[in-house]
Amino acid sequence: MPHAIDVHGHLLVPEANALTAGHPREAADAAAERESFNAHSIEINQAQIKRVFPQLTDVDQRLEDMAASQVTHQIVGPMPMHRYWAEPDLAYALTRTINEAVAAHCHKSPT
């Protein structure tokens, strides 16, 4: 069987998003996004995230999709969550949460 390696797999970490929910800078980022994209683009992006949520979070779904695509290995990393504004304690909590989530996700199927 040929090997195909996907080197750009996204992993969504809802627990990290929960850490910044309600933060004033999170609200400012959301407002900036609304200004950068038109309403139709935002609607499409939100629908897409909802549709692919299982692929972004569930190891079994990821493995099923990989098998269907003949992908034998995948490198996963957290989806862009640019929170450069986070104060040190929050940044530490975000980093720890994200790193632990990536490690747990990969541990379920490490090869």
Regions found by a protein language model. Name each.
Residues 1-111:
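Helix-coil boundary/capping segments in enzymes
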